[in-house]
């Protein structure tokens, strides 16, 4: 199944779990997501209770941070800056930020 067709309520908790396994918190994952995509905590909570897809989550982000395009690195062996599909790039950027958070790296806002 395509990531964009999967339910947000199924995918996002996996990001939270990844961070929590390394001693980070749900609120820290929310904070990174809010910075990246412009959602409020309340909006993220509502999405977790909704039938929204992960594609909806990415496509309808209220305020994508333009600085996100400066984020570089690898996720799953793929260089983020080489990803041409803007939707997939945003997915991978969020994944990278959560990975960095889980590894204890400082997330510069």
Residues of each region from the PLM?
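A charge-rich, low-complexity, intrinsically flexible signal that marks solvent-exposed coils, linkers
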Residues: 1-109
């Amino acid at each position: 199944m395509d990531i964009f067709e999967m339910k947000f309520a199924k995918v996002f908790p996996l990001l939270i779990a990844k961070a929590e396994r390394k001693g980070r918190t749900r609120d820290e994952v929310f904070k990174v997501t809010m910075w990246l995509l412009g959602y409020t905590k309340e909006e993220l909570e509502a999405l977790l209770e909704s039938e929204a897809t992960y594609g909806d989550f990415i496509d309808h982000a209220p305020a994508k941070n333009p600085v996100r395009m400066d984020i570089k690195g690898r996720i799953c062996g793929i260089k983020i800056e080489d990803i041409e599909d803007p939707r997939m790039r945003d997915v991978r950027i969020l994944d990278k930020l959560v990975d960095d958070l889980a590894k204890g790296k400082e997330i510069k806002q």
